[in-house]
Amino acid sequence: MIYRKIDDRSVSVVPQNPDDLFALRRVVRAGDRVAGSTTRAIRKEREYARPDRGERVRIKISLEVEAASLDGMLGRLRLGGTIHESSSEQVKRGSHHSLSVHAGDAISITKDWGPGERKLLRGSGGQGFVLVAVDTSECGIARLHGTHLEMITTLRSGSPGKRYKTSFNIGGYLEAAAAAAGLAVRKGDSLIVFGPGETRKKLANLMQGRRLPEPAVVEGIDSAGEDGIRLFTRSDAMRDSMSGSRMARVMDIIDSVMLLASKKSAKFSMGYAETRAAAEAGAIESLVFSDGLISAAGEQQAVDFLNNAQATGAGIFGADSTTDAGLRVDGLGGVIATLRFKP
């Protein structure tokens, strides 16, 4: 989340991924004012004729929120309410409108801030990592931001393999891979290169001569392409090279819960009902949730539950379904937690 404080009641934010959109959903409430860019049909009324269907134009509005909802399938946050201000004189104040917020959309929020709400927006997402899984046959490039994994591209080298002795120039393939990785890197991102054989080192050396972050070369990943990317995100090599990241922390919590379960300890919870009871007792130390929580509890109940758990001092982490971590939490009821004590 790109975050900037405007004044004591207003902030400007740009969500970067679905984790950020859900953080906004947890913060924005009825009565808050949200300003952003949107489209609206402007109808021309003519005497003795029906109004036409109107031309859809882009305007800036300030909306007093009445309802908020997530549309996970389309990756957007919908904010419905009444227009308080508009950049168009043809849009009447007080008329109803829905503002759709996608990743990359800039909005400003004006409200009476509750405890921890600003921190929730500032801390959403975490550092970004560009992951490159390469060998002599293919190169997979992805960007991991928080726990959201976005596959960027997969390049094929055109190598005939070991069975056929032909002259193959790997230089052009590596040049294309370095260029594609450079396009994926955003400000503040780290760059991690891995894969079988020595190709990863050749690519990392080539990247060092470009305006890119210093690439970290990781060993122990035996696959390239998309398979290599997904193998890396659930490996010990990921935790070593990304220690302190949100993804590494989520994987540590999942493994801690599984270890506690194997020892038949009472200091963990799985599923919405069990974890909600632990939250009501103030027992939660760290909590990981996935999209499955919304399916199990309902959207508003999930938001209230997470906000209440955070108010007791629990560490809250989302696990996106684009990664193995999110799928594992889905399979465990949509939410898991380590506990300070048995409730």
UniProtKB/Swiss-Prot annotation:
GO terms for molecular function: endonuclease activity; metal ion binding. Its cofactor is a divalent metal cation. It is found in: Cytoplasm. GO terms for biological process: nonfunctional rRNA decay; nuclear-transcribed mRNA catabolic process, no-go decay; nuclear-transcribed mRNA catabolic process, non-stop decay; ribosome disassembly; RNA surveillance. Its EC number is 3.1.-.-. One of its GO terms (cellular component) is cytoplasm. Keywords: Cytoplasm, Endonuclease, Hydrolase, Metal-binding, Nuclease. The keyword Manganese does not apply. Pfam families: eRF1_1, eRF1_3. It is an enzyme of class 3 (hydrolase). Monomer. May function in recognizing stalled ribosomes, interact with stem-loop structures in stalled mRNA molecules, and effect endonucleolytic cleavage of the mRNA. May play a role in the release non-functional ribosomes and degradation of damaged mRNAs. Has endoribonuclease activity. The N-terminal domain has the RNA-binding Sm fold. It harbors the endoribonuclease activity. Belongs to the eukaryotic release factor 1 family. Pelota subfamily. This is Protein pelota homolog. It comes from Cenarchaeum symbiosum (strain A).
